[in-house]
Amino acid sequence: MFFGSKMLLCLFQALHQLYYDPNIENKNLAQKWLMQAQVSPQAWHFSWLLLNMDKVPEIQYFGASALHIKISRYWNDIPADQYESLKSQLFTQITRFASGSKIVLTRLCVALASLALSMMPEAWPCAVADMVRMFQAEDSNVDGRARCLALLELLTVLPEEFQTSRLPQYRKGQVRSVLAQECGSVFPLLEQLLQQQDSPGFIKQKVLKCFSSWVQLEIPLMDCENLIQAAFTSLQDPELFDTAVEAVVNAISQPDAQRYVNTLLKLIPPVLGLQEQLRQAVQSGDMETSHGICRIAVALGENHSRALLDQVEHWQSFLALVNMIMFCTGIPGHYPVNETTSSLTLTFWYTLQDDILSFEPDKQAVYQQVYRPVYFQLVDVLLHKAQFPSDEEYGFWSSDEKEQFRIYRVDISDTLMYVYEMLGAELLSSLYDKLGRLLTNTEQPSTWQHTEALLYGFQSIAETIDVNYSDVVPGLIGLIPRISISNVQLADTVMFTIGALSEWLADHPVMINNVLPLVLQALGNPELSISSVSTLKKICRECKYDLPPYAANIVAVSQEVLMKQIHKTSQCMWLMQALGFLLSALQVEEILKNLHSLITPYIQQLEKLADETPNPSNKLAIIHILGLLSNLFTTLDISHHDDDHESTEVKKLPVQQGPNPVVVVLQQVFQLIQKVLSKWLNDAQVVESVCAIFEKSVKTLLDDFAPMVPQLCEMLGQMYSTIPQASAIDLTRQALKRKPDLFLCSNLDVKAVFQCGVLSLKFPEAPTVKASCGFFTELLPRCGEIAPVGQVVHENGKVLLQAVLEGIGGQASRSLMDHFAEILFALNKHCFSYLSIWIKEAMQQDGFPSARVSPEQKETFSQQILRERVNKRRVKEMVKEFTLLCRGLHGTEYTADY
């Protein structure tokens, strides 16, 4: 770029395009050109010209930004003898803009701040004190108030610029220390401005923002004491409230603050003094004020609970703070419509509990005596806050508000689960007693919301805590059928509570019939889709050996809802998984009979779809049916090899003899699946759905899968010959992992499969390449034990190595290097004698795998790989290092974190 009138004209045109041209392409071009201009050597010259007062603010802003970029990023380009001149010019410009455009003033202040950070402490030892002195000096041309605002802006951006600066780490520590000492020049000025009666609101607001900025430099809390007290006073001024809250919270929340316990203790009374203001705000519906005061109370309690708990003689004042936070937790109204404050407090209760439970036993017992009643009160408050509003009110909520409320309830659930650690079984007893009184009190009928909240509390705890030994669960199971369910939200919670107790039901099967009818009835309600289906799945998984008496009814109800298509796809898949668990515990004849009635309608539908011309509509239907079969076979496992249950007579039965029902079904539908596949071989989603059926079957069937091997091999060959798909390669890998003797199958062309795998390594899609790498890491360990594999690797291994090295050399994404490294590791471990020859021959090719690496670097890499046959992590590091060399990226900042 050249500098002169022509360049200035180009700058003005580009800026005009950037701000005013409606064409987005022109804007982008202008922005690109301007960014280059900002970093050019000429920027030192044109920046000052653009700051002329006759220019519009947009142009002036660009000039100020260019100065900041040059100072912050290209500091080393500035000769030391020009530092003072640059400093003086910036002071002059800031003084000129003190009464001008605020955005330009801020940018100039940021530029001077960057200059100060680069110069201090050697070249500018008292930078902050000098800034204060310069702006306090009388200047007849500039209004005193404007000068004050300019100084406050400069002092505010200085710590902010430090936080984002690119200073080296050793310099950062040095400069932080200097700035912390310089607060002695800043804080007295801020205190004076806050205390002056005639200081206008906007000046005080700027002072509080400046203080907020400085406390983040880890200034000792005792040095901030006067300003924190002044900020508390400012909370009474509505104009200053938000800024004062931010200042107090930032000061209290500094990690170093806990060292200054005496100062923290002094802060409790002013925080407690805000309670009346908080109550008035709640009564008048002033959400902003209640939110701000709550933030202050939580900041003090959450950040310093351990330090304050340790001050035993002040236990009453800390307990008062805890009760103030409890008030914030239970603030009236429904979150997030009437209040947004209560959610801020939840992490405080975690922190307080952790700190109490971390004390040694004797001390902990004392604190438990004080705080257990507080936590029981907290449970009541949280369950009240978790209650749904009236149906009428809830109907007016937006979908976003409903989603926020759902997340809020999840947070409450997590808190209740955590509180159980402190309150133990007594908490469950308390919830059970309240629910019992609620359901049996005929004189005062309760709202469904109250019942739902108590059940929600039970569910929250039972989902994660082992309640199998609780003496209240039998009573709860007995109470559930007495609940009058007239509402979707209540019904959902009843379902989820039953699901959470499924493990308990497995140990107490006599109680299953108390709740199973409720679950089956709920299955027919689309509004209860997720809760009813997930609960049935849990019951079928945990209690399957006790469900044969109910199996016919469960299958019939499930089949009916599946045929009615009232559930979404994912719930249909869960339902099939539930039926798979259920059928696994039946006799083979019963399984086959149920399978026939269950899947025949889908097979008939699939036959019809297989005859149709492929289109988007029938594609979705095909994928849905294949998904149903796949999910059924995922959990239908008659081998019981994964079951830990051995207590009942049913579970002691030997593994059933005869054909595996899944194999019987697969053999019956195989031709149909092949027919579907023949029309959809080029569609990755359909191929993936087909592969999923067999992949999940292989996992559960193990040796029983043997009868399917010839047909599966033929189908895989058909897929490979058309187009290698990631899902097909994954299926092959899974099959090889479970049954490596698949390679002994006479129908299998191992060489063709191997070559398809090599071809797939060169595909642009990462999932395909990952799957191919996984295939080879399963295949190569078999080359010593399975002759056909060994022969193919011996004859074609060099081609595989060539493809791997090409990928490492730059043909594949760097994110895939770990996967390529695993192939190299497997080759070295299982084919060492071949690899040492192949890698030498491959590396002798000129420019291979990259023209950027020298023969010496290639030789070093080869020797490193051949030496490492134990540590896979080291091989991955070698490959990452070598690929950077191949790509010309080694040692660049671009790859610093690679």
Enumerate the predicted regions with their spans:
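Karyopherin-beta/Importin-beta family HEAT-repeat alpha-solenoid scaffold
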Residues: F2-Y898
